[in-house]
């Protein structure tokens, strides 16, 4: 079958068979389909859409384009969690130890940060000595011994997705729901877990800017997972403003440890407890109320923090820094960003804050950029707070020559007003195979 005919079929609104999708995807991976042909096909998908069955089949083809991880050497239900990304999104470092402390195996592969969103692997590597590239044997042995390991994603997983994503990024086809869903779920299916909790962030700091868009994406991903025999649920969480106060690698590790010690910010703690509760429900640990009580208990008795330390120790990390934050690498300098007027903060754009932290050296503008683990931002005033002119909004950490550009970027997302804005929900909805439960109405 000719790729030309398949592009034309989708351009005209046709529905692909599985064999046709295999020809397109596998042809692209092995070089028989050119970039310009794949770009044309993906634009046709963007404009014409796909049926749910088509998207499920595309996902399966993409998953099988690389290594399919077999987690069967690890007994019991394995639960994974995936976030669609955001600013200050440090939830994995909190919920993985909570769920593991409750007796559920977590064998998780995570990514690095790119653009305004941070990556779990970068945060972990800010703890001196931490290894995130484990062999499969080491990975399985660690999960079987302590119940928890978080490592970098293997280069061999869903190889079609890597090529397709790079092309989508430069052809204005990133924000296509079937292509986003197949990209995320192909990696999750290939990673081998039995159950998957999706954290679909929504708002200025997220991929999906509206709740309705986020629910549409979540429903499709839940349907794909269910189609492939996995237990899947999705939470729609707010990313108009960052979670917690800290943005940056070692700064976010410190804040995550505070949550595990029972003294973290209220918003971050609550979202993490809800995520952990739903992961425990997916692992058949009990009712939502029972699972919530379990999650709260392992924070209260210190076992979740202890589990986190065990993970870092097993992967070579210096766990002393998790108790004594002064042992982390020190930033070169700090800078106070001051309010320019009196008023309520109506908007504190999460994407702009994330971009400002990248300018300080906490993130990457392009793949392979080095990171300053100590760089970042600590927020003192968030959306809804009243500020006086001259009051500190945030503290920047990094090299002094980067402060001016970062301050300009941060301020471009600030809006002041005379009336306090309504508080946004932390969680908008829960999506399962049985339907959508809205919390914001």
Where are these regions (language model features)?
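Acidic, glycine/proline-rich low-complexity segments that act as flexible tails and inter-domain linkers
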Residues: 1-88, 307-318, 434, 440-441
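Well-ordered secondary-structure scaffolds
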Residues: 5, 17, 28, 68-69, ...
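Short, small-residue-enriched loops and turns at beta-alpha junctions
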Residues: 14, 28, 46-49, 85-87, ...
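Alpha-helix C-terminal capping segments
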Residues: 47, 93-107, 187-192, 224-228, ...
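Glycine/serine-rich anion-binding loops at beta->alpha junctions
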Residues: 77-100, 104-116
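General beta-strand structural signal in soluble alpha/beta enzymes
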Residues: 106-110, 132-135, 150-153, 197-200, ...
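A glycine-rich helix N-cap at a beta->alpha junction
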Residues: 123-149, 219-225, 229
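Phosphate/diphosphate-binding glycine-rich loops and adjacent basic-rich segments that engage nucleotide
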Residues: 144-193
